[in-house]
Amino acid sequence: MPREKQKRGRRAEDKAKKDAAKRKRDEFPEESAVKRLKPSAETDTSNNEVTSGADYIPLEAEDGGNDVSMNDAPANDMPFYGLLDSEEQEYFSKANEVLELNQFHDAEERRLFVDSVYREADGKELKVACSQSCSRLMEKLISLSDMRQIRRLFNKFIGHFLHLVQHRFASHCCETLFINAAPGVTEKISKSKGRKAEVDEEDEPEPELSLAEMFMKVVEELEGNWGYLLTERFASHTIRVLLLVLAGEPVDLSSTDSVVASRKKERLGIVNTEASEENAVAERRKVPEVFEATLKKVMNDMVSGLDNTYLRALATHPVGNPVLQVLVFLELSHFGKASAKDPNSIIRRLIPDDDFGENAESSTFVRGLLYDPVGSRLLETIIKSMPGKLFKSLYKNIIRDRIGSLARNTTAGYVVLRTLERLGKDDLQDAMELIIPEIPGLIERSRLIVPKVLIERCLVRGVDTKPLSDALESAYDKNPARRLEQMLKLEPAASEEDSEEKQKQTGNNQTAAAEKLHGSLLAQTMLTASGPVSGLIYSSLLAQSAESLLRLAKDPTASRVLQQALTTPTSTSQFRRQFTTRFSGHLVELALDSSGSHVVDALWPATKDLFFVKERMAQELLKEELSLRDSFVGRAVWRNWSMDLYKRRRGEWASKAKGLDSIENGQGERPKSRIDLARAKFAAKAAEESSKAPVAAKT
C-alpha cells in the first residue's frame, strides 16, 4: 500500500503554520459580516437565475437597496419580472427577424402577424420589455400597433413605470410607447358591439382608462421622484418624451431639430409605418386641458428642490442637460415668452440679468457655456427660444464683436449658427463682414456649415452675397474644374495601384465621408443663390470633362450637386442646353448605376424647354431597352421617362415631354412662346394707351 506523501523538517512545519494563518485571515471578514441579513431561499434562487441568465440585466442588486441613500431617489428595489425560457426566446427572436425583413404581401398580413405575436406575449410583456434580446421586438411591435393594442399594453405597464423607466432596456420600450400613444390622447373609448364581440373571442377585457388617463397615471407613479429621474441615465430620455407629450409638442425622433433624442439616436421599431402615422407624430397635437396644469406642476416639481447653483450645474451635466433643454424650450415656447419675466422661472434662474454686463452673473454663465461641448447645446436652445429683447442684449454684449472667432471654434460655431438665424438684415450684414475673413480657415478645416448657413440667411434677409462669393472664390483653386473637386473632396483620377493604396489607407474613414457630405451640401446651397455665388458652381460644372462628370454622377454624395444644378430655378436655359448634352452617349451607363440613375431622372425636368435634346435621349434609352428592364434602377428610369408611352404613342409622349398634358388636365398653364409674350406685351401697351385717351380728351 503506497504511503501518504509528507514533507519532513522544520521548514515544512513553519510553512504549514503560515498557510493556516492565511486561511484564518481570509475567513475573518466573513465572520465579521454576520450582522448582514441572510437572504432567504427564494431570494438566493432568484439571484442564481439572474447571474446565470444573460437575458436580464438589473440596475442594482436587490440586497443593497437599503444601503444606498440618495436625495429624492426611490427605494432601490428593482423588481425581477422573470426570464423567458429557451422556447419563448427562440420564438420572439424569429418574430423579430420576420419584422426586420418586412416581406409581408400587404398591411393586412402584417397586422395578423403582429396580433399573433401579441397573443404569444400575453402575460409576458414585462419579461419581454426587460429582455436584452427581445426588447427591440417590443419596440417594433409598439410602432406597428393600432391604438387598441397600445391601450392594452399601456394598461399592463401601469404600476411598473417607476421601475421600467430606469431599466436599461425597458426604458426604450416606454419611450416608444409614449411616442406612439401620443396621437390618441384625445380619442374617447369606443364601446361598439364589434369591439365587444372581439373582446369576448380573445377573453381579454378592454381597459377602462383612456390614454389620457393612463398618462396621468404615469405622472402619479413618478411623482416625488422627478429630481432623481432628471439625471438618471436611462430614465432621462423617457422623461423628455413624457414632457413633450403632455405639452402636445411633436415627438418625432427623426427630426434634426428634435430636442428629445441625442444626435446619435438609433431609430428602432419604425418599420415601414404609414405616412399619416408619421405625420401624426411629427405635428403638434391638441391635448386635454388637464395636461397643461399637470405639465406646469411637473416642471415646477423638477426644479423647485434645486438651488440656482445646482440648476446651472445641470447645464454641463451630460444626462441632465437634455432634460433642461426641454424644460427651457417648453417654458419659453409653450407658456409664452412672458414667463421669462417671472423671477422663479427656469430661464430667469439661469440668466437673472438683462444687461449682460462685464462682471454680471449671466455673462459669466453664458461665456462658460460657449465652449463647453455639453453646455453649448443648452445655449443653442436658449438663443432659439428666448425673447427678442433678451436676445438683442445677449448678442450685443457677448457675441457680436467675437462672432468671427466664435465661428472658428468647433463647439461655439453651432451657437453662431443659431445666432445667425435670428439676426435682422443690418446685423446680418455686419456679422457677414466679420465672418468673411475667417472663411479661408473654415474651408481649410472643413467647417463648411458656417458659410452654408450664412448663404441661407442672406437669401432670406435679402443681403448682398457678392462679398461672400469673392471670399469663397479666393478660398478655392482658381481653376473652375479643380474648384469643384476640392469642394466635394474628390481626388483627380489616378492609376489603379494608387487608388487601391488610398482605399487601404482611408478605408471606413467616417471623417472623410462627413467632410464630403458637408462639401456637397455647401455646393447645393450655393446653387440656390442667384448671382455670383451660384455662378461659381455652374462654371465649375461646365469646365468638367466627360470622365469627371461620369465620376461625379456615380458618386452617391456628389451626384446630388448635379441633380440640384439640373432642377434648381437658378439654372438658365443656356446652361442647361450646354450641360445636358454632355451626358449623351452615357445615359444607359448612368441609368444602370444606383446614383447615376437619379441624375438621368433629373434630366427629364431639366430638358422641359429643350424637346430636341429630350427626344434624342429617349432614343438612346430605347436602344438598350432589354438592359434597362433587367436592372432594378434601370426599370425606374424607364418608368420615369415614360418609355412605354414613347414606344407606342409617340405623339402623347411628345405632349407630356413638353408639359402639355398637365395643361389639359388642369394641372398647370401652358408655357408661352416668345411670340405669345410679344403679343401680350403689345396688347397691354394698347390697353394702357386707350385708357389714357379719354383722360386727355376731358382735359
Swiss-Prot record:
Residues 11-27 have a biased composition (Basic and acidic residues). Pumilio repeats lie at residues 120-155, 156-191, 361-396, 397-433, 540-580, 582-619. The keyword Ribosomal protein does not apply. Transmembrane segments: none annotated. It is found in: Nucleus, Nucleolus. GO terms for cellular component: 90S preribosome; nucleolus; preribosome, small subunit precursor. Residues 42-51 have a biased composition (Polar residues). Belongs to the NOP9 family. It comes from the Eukaryota. This is Nucleolar protein 9. RNA-binding nucleolar protein required for pre-rRNA processing. Involved in production of 18S rRNA and assembly of small ribosomal subunit.
